[in-house]
Amino acid sequence: MSDLAVKVYPGPQEFIDALLPQLEEHELENCQLIAKSRMWARDKVTGGYYAAVLEGEKLKYALCWAPGNLLWLSYSPPDGSDKDYQLVLAQHLAQVEHAVKGVYGFQGCEPGGETFKNAYEEASKQKFKIARGMATYKLIAVKYPEQSLELLKKGTLRPATKDDALELFAGWYRGYCEQCDMPLPSTEESVKAITNLSSVEMLYIWIVGGEPVSMTFKLRPLKYGTSVAGVYTPPELRKRGYATAMMAAFCARLLETFQFVTLHADKENTTSNHIYQDVGFVKTRDTNDYERSE
């Protein structure tokens, strides 16, 4: 413990340059932190807070935050054996005035997230609560549910393009956000998000009978794995197995390039979670969203 020190990095690029190889040792749990840091570096975001607890050169715990965003916590072991590192980093964060004022919430895998929350509450004199109970899932091999086999023959998976009805998918995106209790984007914001995803071949659609019936996103392609999100079927087309068939086909395609596929899901959404488990996703960690309550 005598060699423990908190190192603060000038910005997201310096943070990711220094820590990426060690963050990749637990890429599954660190995928959000890696991807957010890269995105903020690309966009030249300023004014955030990027810090790590180091023992010599060894990374023990880290976080990254940019104004207007959640703060993201790094991997912590399932047995909670890293409490000292979370305490040190929470106490350091509480001394950074602009971060204390600006951090409205954070996400971390448990039990580390709760340990950090308790330490930060005490040090900053603020209160936080779980906003969304989340779970992290991992898939390394696709299972094909019997009821999906016929649909897999009838359906086609492909990336959406500018020639597709992107306004339709923008409406689906709003429905997805509403379903997940996420901030509801405007029509213009939804069209922009869908257009951006399709321009880099990250929006995929499931076609049956020549018509799109479900959609999903590929997100955060990293060294070992990638993430999926945005799994959505409009209400009038549900209970036909479209999403399950799409996810089986989509994940099989992703595993041609990546070692694993991951996703973060609301623990309360039992229907979606059942779909994920049917095609081979296994829950690995609880990963909760916390928000300031006072």
How should each PLM-predicted stretch be described?
Residues 107-113, 263-277, 289-294:
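Conserved beta-strand-loop-alpha-helix junction that forms the acyl-donor binding cleft
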Residues 58, 66-153, 290:
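Acyl-donor-binding surface of acyltransferase catalytic domains
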Residues 82-94, 233, 239-255, 273-278:
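Conserved acetyl-CoA-binding loop-helix of GNAT-fold acetyltransferases
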Residues 2, 7-10, 21, 27, ...:
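Conserved donor-binding loop and adjoining core beta-sheet/short helix segment
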Residues 57, 64-70, 177-181, 188-229:
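Acetyl-CoA-dependent GNAT
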Residues 1-32, 144-184:
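Short amphipathic alpha-helix that is part of the acyltransferase structural core
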Residues 78, 234, 238, 266:
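Residue-level recognition of the GNAT/N-acetyltransferase active site
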Residues 100-110, 254-265:
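Conserved GNAT acetyl-CoA-binding A-motif
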